[in-house]
Structures are given as structure tokens and as C-alpha cells.
Amino acid sequence: GDYRAREANVYRLAEVSNAIIDQCVAQGVPFAREYGGTLDNRSFGGAQVSRTFYAKGQTGQQLLLGAYSALSRQVNVGTVKLFTRYEMQDVVIIDGRARGIIAKNLITGELERFAAHAVVIATGGYGNAYFLSTNAMGCNCTAAISCYRKGAVFANPAYVQIHPTCIPVHGDKQSKLTLMSESLRNDGRIWVPKKKEDAVKLQKGEIKGSDIPEEDRDYYLERRYPAFGNLVPRDVASRAAKERCDAGFGVNNTGLAVFLDFSEAINR
């Protein structure tokens, strides 16, 4: 975490990581495997070694499906009661402790209360506080702000994850972005034109990226960070892409995109 993360938490996560992977396998997550049957590894953004377990290009989705399947089994045996189509409205605080929530039934519109000995908020991020986001539309900060108003403390609210690989935005009215797998940076090379006039032609649709010769392409991540290349951490890749676009070297009709070239991976 570039020395920004809490070292004790990172150390603990590393300690239990093997057990977490084993649990995911037991839940049915179809991780990629080598020919001999052992789990395969690959390198992801921010890592120079192959230490990431993956499920082709759908790792996150398969992890969710595995968790949902395990939850469904507990619902089926009666150890968990699941309420769908509800949205948390507020946290109930008694003597300084969270003792329940107020939730809205999105079907009937009625408010309902749920008491508990402990409350776990597992609502994901709040990316839709920003105009452009790849998050689901429900990640809208309502749960986080409800907790904040009742006295919860944000560890680092500015540290919202910025993802460098998504399908570029088209036009001024689009706010929902489509996420692309992080593994794509492992196989591709990110570049923009070296000449600003080429970028302008690309934005106007006068030429295509394939028309630009190799010597006129700026593989800026490989140039700036030779040790990591295209596998720099997400925030570094995102900031670098924004800097190139702000400087006028962006592509697409909006000028707010960069190229991710897979020609070498395809030839392999």
C-alpha cells in the first residue's frame, strides 16, 4: 500500500490469505489451475511476481458467486434469514453502541426495524458519489453516511479506488462505466500517440490507432516506470492516463481514453 496501509492489518491479511483461498475453493470458486491440478498464479497490477489466484477474466464475479452460493446454503438450512429488496435507512444507537437498523422495504415502501446485538455494515464502496463510476448503482454512499451521522469514523474517505481499465466514456451524459478485467493490463501494453497532431486526428476519426507506426507510439508507463511497466498500481496507472489525456494526447472521440494493445499477446 505504498506505506499508507496499516502494517498490522496487512500482516494479518497475509497470514490468513491461504486459509481464505482454501475457503473460496471449498465454496466452489473455479480458480484457474495448472495442468497438474494445482492452483495457478499470475501477476496483477502493482505486483512484479506471479502471486495472484485468478478465475480467468472473471475473478471478482466468481468470488461473489461463491459467497452467494455459500450464503444460499445457510439460508436453505435455516441458519440465516435473508431479506431481499431492502435498503438501510439508519443505524439504531443505544448507549453508544449499534443495536440495529431501520430499513426500507423497496417493494411496499414501508419502514421496518431490526434489532441486533451487533451490526456489520458490508455495503461495499461509495463510488457513485462521483459522476463516473464502474460500481453498481446501489453503491451510493447512503449506508456509509448513515453510519457517519451516528458517530462512525472514516479511516480515509479520500482513498477511493480508481480503476484504470474500463470501457471509455462516450459523450457527456454517460455516468455508468463498464469495468474491464484487471488481468488485461497483464497481457496488454498501454500507449498514446507521441505526436499531438496524431491524437487530434484520432479524436476526429480521421485515422485509426493501427495507422500509427510503432516509432510514433508512446508506451508511457513502460517509459516512466521501467521496473513495473504496465503493471504499476492502479492509482499510478490512472493518474498517468489522466495526465496524458489532460496534456492533449488522449484518444477516442472524447480525448479521454488511451490504447491498450494486445497484439503481442495475440501473437504469442
Task: Tell what function each PLM region has.
Residues 16-31, 143-157:
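Hydrophobic or amphipathic alpha-helical targeting/insertion segments
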Residues 113-124, 147:
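Short hydrophobic core segments
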